[in-house]
Amino acid sequence: MVSGFPSKMRLWLQTGMILIAGALYSLATPPFQVSDEFNHFLRVVQIASGGWIPEKTLNQGKPATGGTLPANLERAMTPFRNLPFHVNVKTSPRILEQADRDAGALSLDSPDRRFYPFPNTSLYSPAPYLSQSLGLKLGAA
């Protein structure tokens, strides 16, 4: 046990430090600047759509793991496609406006669906994606 602070105070200090570190980390790594960010996004959409367990299927004749999601998701991701591995390219108001326009047509319940492979993130438990999935679900409502 660490002395100096009551346990309740320690909890609040740790929570505050984690929130500050998380905020700084999210500012240091802009949206879609990481190589597998699109796969994390697809996993969030899958969970928000009620797909807790990834699908295993053949995609272009090869085994693939992922999910059947709204076909127009690609439109929502397109504005960010040139960001990964290009640290000189930043998210701009123009990119965000285009993404907002394209996401406006996005519906989690769209009957037009296609299979998206996301083999790396489909291995993860849904638990880390619950808050983002809830936000996506509330935003779509």
State what each model feature region is.
Residues M1-A23:
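Start-transfer (signal-anchor) and selected internal transmembrane alpha helices
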Residues S3, S7, Q46, S133-L136:
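Short hydrophobic helices that act as membrane-entry/anchoring signals
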Residues G4, K8, T29-F32, F118-P126:
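Conserved aromatic-histidine-acidic binding/catalytic patches
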Residues F5-S7, E37-H40:
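Short alpha-helical segments used as structural interaction elements across diverse proteins
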Residues L24-F38:
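Helix-to-loop transition at the C-terminal end of transmembrane segments
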